[in-house]
C-alpha cells in the first residue's frame, strides 16, 4: 500500500494543506506538507476532531415516568359508597454531571481515600513501635533481676553445703519462679493493652472516615439534588405509596363465622376488609366490589405458575418434505434467530422465510438436541393411489407402437396406408406437429400406433412417445439415409429399453439405396438380422404399399416375444399423450390407457388436475363409453389442462382426488418458489458480465401442450449474447383480452400457433397497435422470430473504396492552398465522400475534399479516365506521385 502524504490527504478530504497541518498540530501531531501520515495518526486526528465538534457526546438528561392506579371508596348519596379510580403520575428527570464536576468529585474522593489510608498506616506503625519498646524493657528488667540473684547466691555460698543451704536454695528458686510469673503476667497485660489501644485507634479512624463519607454525600446532595439513581427513586416512591395506603386503611373487624368460607369471602369483598389481606390482593377486593350482586368466587392467586426449566426441553419434531425456518423454529419452541445462528455455524446463510429440505432440517434439529420424526406429506396421495383393485386377472394386450424418424421420411404417410386414411394431408405443411394416437385392427390382432413429429423442435414429444411405447418403428428414407432426428430416435429407444424395428421407406424410388441405410445405421449400434444383429429391417413403400404386411407381421411377432399383458377389468390407469384447451368443450386430454378399463363417469386424477369423465371420444371423433388397455381416447371434464406426460389414474373418491390435486399444486408452487429463492449473487455477477442485452418479448399461445413446449424450447434456443427471447406468457388455448393487454403493456409480439384471438382481444390489438401474428407451421414461426431478432442486432459498418486518383501536378491557390492536379485511375471521385492521401501505399492523411473542379467548374463527381483538380481540406502537403483514395461507409445488416 502506498504511503499517504499530508498534501495528498488534504486533496482527498477537500481541505487546504495549511488547514490540515494546523489541525494535526492542534491534535498534538507535528507534520509538514511532505510528511507521510500513518493510519494511527489519521485515527488520532479523527478522534480529536470528533471530540472538538461533539461527535461522541452522550446524552446528559433522562426523564422517567411512572404511573400507579389505585381505588378509593367514596361515600355517595343514599348511604351507598362507590369506588373511584385514582391515577397518580410521577415524573423524574435525571441530569448527568458535567465532566469537570465529575473529575473534581473523583479527585476529592481519591484524596480522601489516600488520607484515610495514610492515617491508618500511621496508627498501625505507632502501635507496633510502642509494643516493641514495652517488650524490650520487660526483657531487660528480667535479665537484670537474674544477674542480681546470681551474684547474691555466689557471694553468700558457704564452703560446705548444709541442710539449711538446701532449704534456702529451694526458697530462692520458689521466689524466682514467682517473680517470673509476675513478669509474664505483666508482659501479657501490657501486650493486651497495646492491642486494645490499636483497636481503639482503628475504630476511631473508621468512625471518622464514616463521618467524612457522610459529610461528602451530603455535600454532593447539596450541590445537585437531581443526582440520584433510579433504584433509590423507585424505593422512595414505594415507601411513600405504602405509607399512604396505611394511613387510608381501617382495620377489619373479625368475622363472627370464621369457618364459613362463603361469608369470609363475602367479607373480604367489603371496603372495610382490605387491611388484613395486604397489597397483593387489592385486585381481588376491587373485583369483589365491582360484582356485589353476583356470586362471590374464591380469590385467585397473583403468583404465576411458571417455573424455570432445569434443563433444555427436548421435543419430538415432526418434519415434512419441506419446511420453512419460521415453521421449524415454532415446532422446536425456540426463536428463529437460533436456527439461523446454528445454520451459520454449519456454513449456510438462510432467512426466516426460506424453505429448507427435509435432510437439512433434520440435521439442524438433531444438532440442537431434538428428536426428529420424518413424515411424508403425500401420505394421502399414497393412500388414494393404493386404494385400487386387488387380485385381478391379467390378460394379453395389444402392443403400443411408436413411429419415429426424421422429418419428411414418410412416417405419417406409412401410417396413412395402414389406416387407409389421409392423415398427412390434414397436417399443416404436410408435417406432423402433434402426437397422433390411433389403433388399427388387423387379421392377426389389434395394434396401437403413436405418430411423433420428426422436426427438431419436438424432442420432448418424441421422448414421451418412446416412454409410453412397447415397440419403436424407425422410418428411414432409402434415398436420404440417416439424419439427425434419426439418430435422436435411436437414442430415445435405447434409453427406454424399447426394441427397434427399422422400416426402410421410399423403396420404390430409383435412387433408393437400402444397403447404404444399413451401413449408416450400423455405425450407431443398429445392426440388421442379415448382418448378425438383433434388429429387423423391412423394406416398405408408403406409396404403393410394398412391405406393409411384412411390417405388421414383424410388429405382432415382436409383441408375442415380449408377452405383453395388462389388467383388463378394474380401475384404469394411463398416461397423457397430448392435451389442449378447446373453446367449446374445455380442457381435453388424449390419454393412452395402459391398464384397466376407463369408463364414462369415472373420477380421474391427472397430474395437477382432477375431474369426472363427462365424455369420451376415439381418434376418429366418435363418442364411446369405455376404453380398454392400449386404446387411445380423448376425455373431457378435467378441472384444467394437464401437462403432457402426466399419469392419469382412476380413483374412488372425488373429494380425495381434489385434495391430492390441491396438494400437488401447492407442492409445485413451493418447489417453484424454492427455485426462485436460490442465491442471487451468481445472477447478479452474470448480469454484470452480460451488460446491455436486447430482448424480444413474446406472448405465445398454442393449440396443444406438446406444441407449446416444442415452440418455447426452440425460441429460447435462438437467444444469443446480444439478443434474448423473453416469453413473458405462454398457454394453451385462444388469445384473450388479458393476453393482448399484457402484450401492449410489455411491448411484446402476440404469437398464435393454430389458435386465434377473440373479439375483445382484437379490439385491444387494434387500439394499442399490438403486433399479432398467426402461424400453422413451426418452420415459419421460428424463421420469422429469427428475422425479428436479426433486426434487433447492432449493424456492422464496412468501408468500400469507390475511386482512386493519382496526383500529376500541384498548383497553389490563394484561397484554398495546394491544389492537386489528378488523373482518375479507378472508379469515381465524389465530392461528398471522405478521402485518404497515400504516399508509397501508406496512408498519411485522412479527411475530406474541400473542392473538386474540372476546367474551373465545380463538379460533384469525376469518372475514371478524366482529369480534375482536388483541394484537400486542412492539408497542404500534397506531392506529385501521391494517391488520393475516395471511400464510403456502408452499413451491413447482421443475421443470426
UniProtKB/Swiss-Prot annotation:
Residues 505-508 are annotated as: G4. Residues 117-303 are annotated as: Disordered. Pfam families: EF-G_D2, GTP_EFTU, GTP_EFTU_D2, IF-2, IF2_assoc, IF2_N. GTP binds at residues 405-412, 451-455, 505-508. Residues 541-543 are annotated as: G5. Residues 117-174, 196-227 have a biased composition (Basic and acidic residues). Residues 430-434 are annotated as: G2. One of its GO terms (cellular component) is cytosol. Its main location: cytoplasm. Residues 396-563 form the tr-type G domain. Residues 405-412 are annotated as: G1. Residues 175-195, 254-268 have a biased composition (Low complexity). Keywords: Cytoplasm, GTP-binding, Initiation factor, Nucleotide-binding, Protein biosynthesis. CDD domains: IF2_eIF5B, IF2_mtIF2_II, mtIF2_IVc. It is found in: Cytoplasm. Residues 451-454 are annotated as: G3. It comes from the Bacteria. GO terms for molecular function: GTP binding; GTPase activity; guanosine tetraphosphate binding; translation initiation factor activity. Belongs to the TRAFAC class translation factor GTPase superfamily. Classic translation factor GTPase family. IF-2 subfamily. PANTHER family: TR-TYPE G DOMAIN-CONTAINING PROTEIN (PTHR43381:SF5), TRANSLATION INITIATION FACTOR IF-2-RELATED (PTHR43381). One of the essential components for the initiation of protein synthesis. Protects formylmethionyl-tRNA from spontaneous hydrolysis and promotes its binding to the 30S ribosomal subunits. Also involved in the hydrolysis of GTP during the formation of the 70S ribosomal complex. This is Translation initiation factor IF-2. It comes from Shewanella pealeana (strain ATCC 700345 / ANG-SQ1).
Amino acid at each position: 500500500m502506498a504511503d499517504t502524504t499530508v498534501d495528498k490527504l488534504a486533496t482527498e478530504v477537500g481541505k487546504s494543506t495549511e488547514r490540515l497541518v494546523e489541525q494535526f498540530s492542534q491534535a498534538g501531531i507535528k507534520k509538514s506538507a511532505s510528511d507521510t501520515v500513518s493510519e494511527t495518526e489519521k485515527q488520532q486526528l479523527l478522534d480529536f476532531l470528533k471530540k472538538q465538534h461533539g461527535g461522541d457526546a452522550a446524552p446528559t438528561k433522562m426523564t422517567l415516568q411512572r404511573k400507579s392506579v389505585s381505588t378509593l371508596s367514596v361515600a355517595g348519596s343514599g348511604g351507598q359508597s362507590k369506588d373511584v379510580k385514582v391515577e397518580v403520575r410521577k415524573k423524574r428527570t435525571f441530569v448527568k454531571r458535567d465532566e469537570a464536576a465529575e473529575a473534581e468529585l473523583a479527585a476529592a474522593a481519591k484524596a480522601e481515600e489516600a488520607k484515610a489510608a495514610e492515617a491508618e498506616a500511621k496508627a498501625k506503625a505507632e502501635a507496633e513501635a510502642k509494643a516493641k519498646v514495652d517488650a524490650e524493657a520487660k526483657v531487660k528488667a528480667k535479665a537484670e533481676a537474674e544477674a542480681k540473684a546470681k551474684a547474691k547466691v555466689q557471694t553468700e555460698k558457704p564452703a560446705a553445703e548444709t541442710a539449711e543451704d538446701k532449704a534456702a536454695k529451694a526458697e530462692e528458686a520458689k521466689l524466682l519462679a514467682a517473680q517470673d510469673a509476675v513478669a509474664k503476667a505483666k508482659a501479657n497485660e501490657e501486650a493486651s493493652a497495646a492491642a486494645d489501644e490499636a483497636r481503639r485507634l482503628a475504630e476511631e479512624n473508621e468512625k471518622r472516615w464514616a463521618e467524612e463519607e457522610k459529610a461528602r454525600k451530603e455535600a454532593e446532595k447539596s450541590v445537585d439534588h437531581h443526582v440520584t439513581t433510579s433504584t433509590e427513586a423507585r424505593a422512595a416512591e414505594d415507601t411513600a405509596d405504602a405509607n399512604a395506603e396505611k394511613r387510608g386503611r381501617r382495620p377489619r373487624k373479625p368475622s363472627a363465622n370464621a369457618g364459613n368460607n362463603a361469608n369470609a369471602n363475602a367479607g373480604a369483598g367489603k371496603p372495610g376488609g382490605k387491611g388484613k389481606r395486604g397489597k397483593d390482593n387489592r385486585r381481588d377486593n376491587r373485583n369483589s366490589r365491582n360484582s356485589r350482586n353476583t356470586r362471590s368466587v374464591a380469590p385467585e392467586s397473583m403468583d404465576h405458575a411458571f417455573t424455570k426449566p432445569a434443563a433444555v426441553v427436548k421435543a419430538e419434531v415432526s418434519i415434512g418434505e419441506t419446511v420453512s425456518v419460521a415453521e421449524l423454529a415454532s415446532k422446536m419452541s425456540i426463536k428463529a434467530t437460533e436456527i439461523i445462528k446454528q445454520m451459520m455455524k454449519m456454513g449456510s446463510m438462510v432467512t426466516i422465510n426460506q424453505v429448507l429440505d427435509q435432510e437439512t432440517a433434520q440435521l439442524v434439529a438433531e444438532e440442537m438436541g431434538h428428536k426428529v420424526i420424518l413424515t411424508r406429506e403425500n401420505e394421502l396421495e399414497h393412500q388414494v393411489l393404493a386404494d385400487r383393485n386387488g387380485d385381478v386377472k391379467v390378460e394379453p394386450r395389444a402392443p403400443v407402437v411408436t413411429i419415429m424418424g426424421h422429418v419428411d421420411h414418410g412416417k405419417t404417410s406409412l401410417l396413412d396406408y395402414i389406416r387407409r386414411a389421409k392423415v398427412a394431408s390434414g397436417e399443416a405443411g404436410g408435417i406432423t406437429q402433434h402426437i397422433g394416437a390411433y389403433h388399427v385392427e388387423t387379421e392377426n390382432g389389434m395394434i396401437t400406433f403413436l405418430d411423433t413429429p420428426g422436426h427438431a423442435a419436438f424432442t420432448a414429444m418424441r421422448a414421451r412417445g418412446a416412454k409410453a411405447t412397447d415397440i419403436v418403428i424407425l422410418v428411414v428414407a432409402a434415398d436420404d439415409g440417416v439424419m439427425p432426428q434419426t439418430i435422436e430416435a435411436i437414442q430415445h429407444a435405447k434409453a427406454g429399453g424399447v426394441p427397434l424395428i427399422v422400416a426402410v421407406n421410399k423403396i420404390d424410388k430409383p435412387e433408393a439405396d437400402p444397403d447404404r441405410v444399413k451401413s449408416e445405421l450400423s455405425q450407431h449400434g443398429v445392426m440388421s438380422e442379415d448382418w448378425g444383429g438383433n434388429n429387423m429391417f423391412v423394406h416398405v413403400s408408403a406409396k404403393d404399399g410394398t412391405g406393409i404386411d411384412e411390417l405388421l407381421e414383424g410388429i405382432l411377432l415382436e409383441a408375442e416375444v415380449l408377452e405383453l399383458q395388462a389388467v383388463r377389468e378394474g380401475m384404469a390407469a394411463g398416461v397423457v399423450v397430448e392435451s389442449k384447451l378447446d373453446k367449446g368443450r374445455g380442457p381435453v386430454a388424449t390419454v393412452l390407457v395402459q391398464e384397466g378399463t376407463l369408463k364414462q363417469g369415472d373420477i380421474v386424477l391427472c397430474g395437477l388436475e382432477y375431474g369426472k369423465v363427462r365424455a369420451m371420444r376415439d381418434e376418429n371423433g366418435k363418442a364411446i363409453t369405455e376404453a380398454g388397455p392400449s386404446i387411445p381416447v380423448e376425455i373431457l371434464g378435467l378441472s384444467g389442462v394437464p401437462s403432457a406426460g402426466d399419469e392419469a389414474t382412476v380413483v374412488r373418491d372425488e373429494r380425495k382426488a381434489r385434495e391430492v390435486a390441491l396438494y400437488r399444486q401447492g407442492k409445485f408452487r413451493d418447489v417453484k418458489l424454492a427455485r426462485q429463492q436460490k442465491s442471487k449473487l451468481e445472477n447478479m455477477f452474470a448480469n454484470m458480465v452480460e451488460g446491455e442485452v436486447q430482448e424480444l418479448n413474446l406472448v405465445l399461445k398454442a393449440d396443444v401442450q406438446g406444441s407449446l413446449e416444442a415452440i418455447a424450447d426452440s425460441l429460447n434456443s435462438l437467444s444469443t449474447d446480444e439478443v434474448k427471447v423473453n416469453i413473458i406468457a405462454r398457454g394453451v388455448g385462444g388469445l384473450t383480452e388479458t393476453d393482448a393487454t399484457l402484450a401492449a403493456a410489455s411491448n411484446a409480439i402476440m404469437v398464435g400457433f393454430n389458435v386465434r384471438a377473440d373479439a375483445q382481444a382484437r379490439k385491444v390489438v387494434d387500439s394499442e397497435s399490438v403486433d399479432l401474428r398467426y402461424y400453422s407451421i413451426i418452420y415459419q414461426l421460428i424463421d420469422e422470430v429469427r428475422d425479428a431478432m436479426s433486426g434487433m442486432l447492432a449493424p456492422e459498418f464496412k468501408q468500400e473504396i469507390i475511386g482512386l486518383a493519382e496526383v500529376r501536378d500541384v498548383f497553389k491557390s490563394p484561397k484554398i492552398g495546394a491544389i492537386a492536379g489528378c488523373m482518375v485511375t479507378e472508379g469515381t471521385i465524389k465530392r461528398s465522400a471522405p478521402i485518404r492521401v497515400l504516399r508509397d501505399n501508406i496512408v498519411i492523411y485522412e479527411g475530406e475534399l474541400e473542392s473538386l473542379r474540372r476546367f474551373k467548374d465545380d463538379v460533384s463527381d469525376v469518372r475514371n479516365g478524366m482529369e480534375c483538380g482536388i483541394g484537400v481540406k486542412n492539408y497542404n502537403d500534397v506531392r506529385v506521385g501521391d494517391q488520393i483514395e475516395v471511400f464510403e461507409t456502408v452499413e451491413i445488416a447482421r443475421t443470426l
